[in-house]
């Protein structure tokens, strides 16, 4: 019943496969938001995680897939060389970090900023987007995409074009005027305005469509699928997955 949604990139592929093409991806809207954070200075490279236990949320989802892949590319195995204490919510990771002065966590924005607001000693140790590009120079770590129902595309193409035009403008507004956007984020109860003001510029919000979208997303999904086919619903979708490309 949903015509348009913003969801994790791998979930878009899974949904496309499971619904036999009921939704197409229209644009990328968020690039990397995943970071390794700590209160100390023990972590400066991925191999420093060996023998450590991290707090994280997202088991069976992008955080786990990304961490597992990057560890494997650096000669380590998740669950053997690096342990994770999985939490059901990112907020639980923030709470655990607040109680553990030696804690290390895998967190997305804006929860990194939330954690830092509670403890100014928490620092970003690793940017997983940078780590991803270090082993895949031609690929980007993609967090989110916007999907549109194939039926809406077929029945109301002009409405879809108008929607995407307004959406592109909205993204530009959030990127160019983060303080104003943060006011709206606070107003609608997404996260408090002070957190949003700090976090928004760090969230890698973007609007990428057409051929650039297809190139970046197909590369990203291909890498995920090679490591774990179930991460993308069994297989990387074909050309008909991409709207306007």
Predicted regions span which residues?
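Pocket-lining segment of extracytoplasmic ligand-binding domains
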Residues: 9-11, 19, 91-185
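Secondary-structure end/capping motifs
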Residues: 153-227
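Solvent-exposed, acidic/flexible segments
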Residues: 5, 29, 56, 60-64, ...
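Well-formed, non-transmembrane alpha-helical positions, independent of function
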Residues: 14, 48, 95-96, 114, ...
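Conserved C-terminal helix/tail region of periplasmic/extracytoplasmic solute-binding proteins
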Residues: 218-245
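Short, glycine-/small- and polar/acidic-enriched structural segments
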Residues: 1-80, 84-86, 103, 109, ...
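Short, surface-exposed acidic
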Residues: 78-82, 189-201, 231-238
């Amino acid at each position: 019943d949903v015509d348009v949604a913003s969801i994790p990139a791998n979930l878009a592929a899974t949904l496309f496969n499971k619904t036999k093409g009921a939704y197409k991806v229209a644009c990328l809207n968020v690039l990397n938001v995943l970071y390794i954070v700590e209160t100390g200075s023990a972590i400066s490279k991925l191999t420093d995680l060996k023998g450590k236990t991290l707090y994280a949320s997202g088991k069976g989802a992008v955080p786990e897939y990304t961490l597992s892949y990057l560890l494997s590319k650096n000669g380590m195995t998740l669950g053997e060389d690096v342990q994770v204490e999985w939490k059901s919510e990112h907020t639980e990771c923030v709470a655990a970090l607040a109680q553990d002065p030696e804690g290390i966590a895998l967190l997305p924005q804006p929860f990194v900023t939330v954690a830092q607001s509670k403890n100014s000693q928490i620092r970003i140790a690793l940017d997983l987007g940078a780590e991803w590009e270090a082993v895949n120079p031609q690929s980007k770590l993609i967090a989110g995409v916007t999907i549109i129902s194939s039926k809406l595309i077929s029945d109301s193409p002009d409405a879809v074009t108008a929607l995407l035009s307004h959406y592109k403008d909205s993204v530009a507004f959030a990127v160019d005027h983060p303080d104003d956007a943060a006011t709206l984020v606070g107003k609608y109860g997404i996260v408090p305005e002070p957190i949003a003001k700090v976090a928004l510029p760090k969230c890698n919000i973007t609007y990428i469509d057409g051929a650039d979208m297809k190139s970046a997303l197909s590369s990203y999904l291909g890498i995920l699928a090679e490591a774990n086919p179930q991460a993308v619903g069994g297989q990387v979708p074909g050309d008909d997955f991409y709207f306007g490309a």
